[in-house]
């Protein structure tokens, strides 16, 4: 299929253009002093699911603002909460684009040694429990959970 292809240049990776999110965005992915929210690759969050998730979070926070509700601040123990914290924490140094990964999630503090599989399951169990409790406390945004 590529026998007649002409290559313009070899060895060039794609180039990401992204804002210095920790210094220009608030925790809702908003640009302070404006009505603008950003999401996806431009914020330095990489990946298709990360783009969808940050877009949904930006939309939910826009809705929260419209109904005069407190913005969502997801627990850092979950994938999206940890990614948002990394992307919007002004203390982040040398900001670079990032996928969701377990390195962003706070460690388990129970002192138990686990296999990788069991550790990841413990991360998931903790994240699910904290997210469920948090969303249950936000009935103004999620009335069906009340």
Regions found by a protein language model. Give the residues of each.
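C-terminal auxiliary extensions adjacent to catalytic cores
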Residues: 97-146
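Short, well-ordered loop/turn and helix-capping segments at boundaries between secondary-structure elements
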Residues: 48, 61-68, 85, 89-93, ...
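Internal hydrophobic alpha-helix adjacent to the cofactor/substrate pocket in enzyme cavities
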Residues: 52-74
């Amino acid at each position: 299929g590529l026998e007649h292809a002409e290559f313009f240049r070899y060895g060039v990776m794609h180039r990401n253009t992204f804002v210095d999110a920790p210094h220009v965005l608030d925790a809702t992915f908003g640009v302070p002093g404006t009505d603008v929210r950003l999401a996806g690759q431009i914020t330095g969050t990489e990946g298709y699911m990360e783009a969808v998730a940050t877009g949904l979070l930006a939309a939910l926070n826009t809705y929260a603002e419209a109904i005069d509700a407190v913005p969502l601040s997801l627990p850092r123990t979950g994938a999206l909460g940890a990614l948002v914290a990394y992307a919007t924490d002004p203390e982040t140094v040398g900001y670079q684009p990032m996928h969701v990964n377990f390195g962003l999630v706070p460690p388990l503090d129970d002192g138990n040694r686990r296999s990788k599989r069991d550790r990841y399951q413990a991360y998931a169990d903790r994240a699910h429990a904290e997210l469920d409790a948090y969303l249950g406390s936000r009935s103004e945004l999620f009335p069906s959970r009340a």
